[in-house]
Amino acid sequence: VSISYGTGEEGDGQTENQFISSLYQQASSEGMSVFVSSGDEGSAENDHRGANPTHGISISGWQSTAFDTSVGGTDFADTFLGTSKKYWNKKNTANYGSAKSYMPEMPWDDSCANVPLSTSKGFATPYGSAGYCNNGGPHSSVAGSGGPSNCATGTGTGGLINGTCAGWPKPSWQKLVGVPNDGVRDTPDVSLMAANGLWGHYYVFCDTSGGTCGSDPSTWPGAGGTSFASPIWAGFMALIVHAKGEPQGLINPTLYSIANEEYGKKGSKACNSSNKKTSKPNTTCIFYDVTLGDNDVNCLGTVNCYLPSGTAGVLSTSDSDYEPAYGTGKGYDFATGIGTVNVANLVNAWP
């Protein structure tokens, strides 16, 4: 099952959040594996793609339960790294294939607050009066979502995470290098390519609502978002179910178990998606650990917004220091979760 709906935990309220969690729990008990898009709003779900978020850090209540697999979004990093020729064919193959191999990834993020984007435009920082967000950079909160559950229960006010807000407790299976000791459910669990064109990458798809599509995909429309990533992950799960001959239910315990074997206590250099410009992850990797970039977005106001000077700030876990919400790191992180996946290796490794 794949779900692409999403609204903030605080706005949904405790009753609806509990209802969603109970539905997913029932589904998993009946053998269903539930995948939910983490969202396309960075870590500012309560502003839902607003140009200048003002409500601080928040995530979708549709994907923050302990009974679903939250799917975040990445972008390919070849354009930023200047290595596109290494990974793409000059022309499509007879079957319209274009990629030569797996390529480096980074979190999907269209905002001026994104460090790779601001760096590529020649700015030392995305924030401050001399930063990219205050000098023509795109004010956008469109990015792969992720962050800690912070208002699944209790009540906030005015779209803010305050009052009696509290997150879902951390599931026993959510253990991995990089997982914070915050006591709450962290999202996403995994990620997949979700870019919508900023760096030249997006999904080509056939929209038949206006008629049939031509035979050449180069004439088809393109788009991105975690609403692509989530159903594709559900497709991966269908391969596993077919291989094992039986439904699997909630797969998160197995995902984190496999990731722990691969990453260990210090992360895995061999499976680092973003290790070097010229290197590729080992062909035996099941997960690719994304360690380049962030899913940070621009913001206004004084709630989780670092604004040292200028008029536009960047989403931060600190108002007084630059602590981007959120960066990448070894193993798990709020920008991409465990990371992305080698599907064939995952199917073959599934217990």
Residue ranges and their predicted role:
Residues V1-P351:
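Extracellular protease catalytic domains of secreted zymogens
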